[in-house]
Amino acid sequence: MQTQSTVEVRGKSLKVKVAVTNEGDESAYNVQIYVNENHRIKTSHVKRYLDIKESFEYESHYDLVQEKQGRYPLIIGVDYTDANEYPFTATAVTYYSFGSDTVPKIFGSAGDVKLTGYAKFPLKLRNMDEVTKEVHIYMITPKELSVQEKVREITLQPQSELTTIFDVNNLSALPGSRYQVFFILEYEDESKHYSSVIPCFINLDVLNSFFKKYKWYFIGGPSTLFIVFIVFQFLLQNSKQSKQGPLN
């Protein structure tokens, strides 16, 4: 599911337009778009059926209540199912500027992670400023994944680096799938608000998942064949002795 969004700010009014397109190889069902602005969530109506290459659009409006000018994050998601009612989620994160834009001095990096049932997801942060920063971190994932302590606060000393680790669990994500996840970093000074978004991917390990499910077939199969071979040799030896008869 491909998501595109545009944002427009006029004074204290925010308009968000979202368009989702079914780029998969089968139809999607029960499609619903949601927009999360500062924990205020608005949702579209449910579109029962979205054909391949078909698009679905939704527009939402917010009255902004921010006191400080700057850059703020905006979370966009799409819930849908396949023909068998199996649920899926697609997420995206963008931002809007209220008043004047800001350039953050906190930078982060995270690599892609392989996940079977559980994985640790390291996030490396760097403070380029000469002032200590109190940083709020949010990890945004699809609903198929769960995160322990997905919201946290850390203190970054001036011109320093720090690595924090998030624990991610697989709730219902399918083996072989690839999910985009995001880290949102936010902090403020006396007059401005700053935010940055770090995108990365979680890859569901299909080989490990397959082996885990069928490992006893791989382990037990050779053992069973070995036992059958021994029994066959024993019966063959007895058959030869019976044909030869007793020794004189």
State each model region's role:
Residues 8, 48-56, 154-163:
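Short proline/glycine- and polar residue-rich coil/turn motifs
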Residues 1-5, 43-47, 107-110, 149-152:
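Surface-exposed, proline-enriched loop/turn segments that connect beta strands in immunoglobulin-like
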Residues 240-248:
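Cytoplasmic C-terminal tails of single-pass
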Residues 6-12, 112-117:
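Short, solvent-exposed loop/linker segments at the N-terminal edge
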Residues 21-41, 126-145:
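Short acidic, flexible loop segments centered on an aromatic residue
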